[in-house]
């Protein structure tokens, strides 16, 4: 005999006044509509399920890319072995209590997964480099990852504003060995001019690779161009991983409290076109603009790749000096 008793769960759902008001056939699939209780999660919600799902998918994607690469020649080619090759060398990644997932016994957080993607992209160049410059490194995740994966690095120069450098210095001092930490030279924005003069008197390029990830897009255009000119004169390679465009908050259902913040963001960086970041044709067109905009004078594009998932409107590009 079939039990015709209603589920208590569904009785509660159908008696919910909110859902009674949101069952219109014209709108039941929109954000906040009744369909989020039937076939899918709501597009906007307060849990971490979407973030963790994207993190897992990113780990899977990157791990497969590494394992299938012609430059990856490791005995451990099982699932998880690709990202493990880099992550296992990066100690103390849990500082700061990041959100993590477990991918084939790799405890993965987003920041260090991004770092693995970046050092894998730059692997060939990093192996032969001694001097690295990173402009605007955030709290230092990439510096941490590079210094622990590439022991050939002798000097790691970091340029940032003073208040951010305080966090970077404190973080890296905690996670790095004293010998690796001693390789870092912190250069305040105010001391950048002295660093430029020091580079000018050098008989050869002071920097092997200059790096900027996710910050040139947030800096005034004239400052970005000044950095690119310095890189052009003093570096063999330049690696950029920045947003290729701007987007309107409505595209991701953000309700602005202060339009001044958005208007200020539109003035930053070199790529200021506002596009639909979920339109493949618009992204493909804007990538060409980005690749040209961030190429230093007398440099050429060496290689590039699109970014994954929530970073699909970002792009990795490595430029090489024509004089190298």
Regions found by a protein language model. Give the residues of each.
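Conserved beta-strand signature within the Rossmann-like core of class I S-adenosyl-L-methionine
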Residues: 235-247
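N-terminal accessory regions of S-adenosyl-L-methionine
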Residues: 1-108, 302, 310, 316-318
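A conserved beta-strand element that flanks and buttresses the S-adenosyl-L-methionine
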Residues: 211
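S-adenosyl-L-methionine
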Residues: 171-204
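Conserved SAM-binding loop of SAM-dependent methyltransferases across substrates and taxa
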Residues: 139-152
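Conserved class I S-adenosyl-L-methionine
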Residues: 129-138
């Amino acid at each position: 005999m079939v039990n015709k008793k209603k589920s208590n769960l569904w009785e509660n759902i159908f008696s919910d006044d909110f859902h009674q008001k949101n069952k219109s056939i014209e709108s039941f699939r929109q954000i906040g509509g009744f369909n989020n209780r039937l076939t899918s999660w709501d597009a906007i919600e307060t849990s971490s399920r979407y973030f963790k799902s994207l993190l897992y998918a990113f780990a899977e994607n990157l791990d497969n890319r590494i394992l299938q690469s012609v430059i990856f020649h490791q005995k451990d080619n099982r699932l998880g072995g690709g990202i493990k090759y880099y992550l296992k060398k990066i100690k103390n990644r849990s500082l700061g209590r990041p959100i993590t997932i477990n991918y084939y016994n790799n405890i993965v957080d987003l920041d260090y997964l991004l770092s693995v993607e970046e050092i894998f992209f730059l692997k060939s160049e990093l192996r032969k480099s001694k001097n690295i410059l990173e402009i605007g490194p955030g709290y230092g995740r990439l510096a941490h990852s590079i210094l622990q994966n590439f022991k050939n690095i002798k000097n790691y120069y970091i340029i940032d504003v003073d208040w951010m450098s305080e966090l970077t210095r404190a973080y890296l001092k905690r996670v790095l060995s004293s010998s690796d930490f001693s390789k870092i030279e912190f250069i305040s924005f105010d001391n950048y001019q002295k660093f430029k003069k020091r580079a000018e008197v050098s008989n050869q390029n002071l920097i092997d690779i200059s790096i900027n990830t996710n910050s040139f897009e947030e800096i005034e255009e004239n400052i970005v161009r000044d950095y690119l000119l310095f890189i052009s004169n003093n570096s063999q390679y330049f690696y950029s991983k920045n947003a290729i465009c701007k987007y309107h908050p409505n595209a991701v259902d953000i309700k602005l409290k202060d339009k001044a913040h958005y208007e200020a963001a539109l003035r930053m960086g070199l790529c200021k076109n506002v596009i639909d970041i979920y339109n493949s044709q618009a992204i493909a067109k804007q990538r060409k603009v980005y690749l040209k905009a961030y190429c230093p004078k007398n440099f050429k594009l060496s290689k590039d790749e699109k970014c994954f998932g929530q970073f699909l409107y970002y792009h990795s590009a490595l430029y090489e000096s024509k004089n190298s």
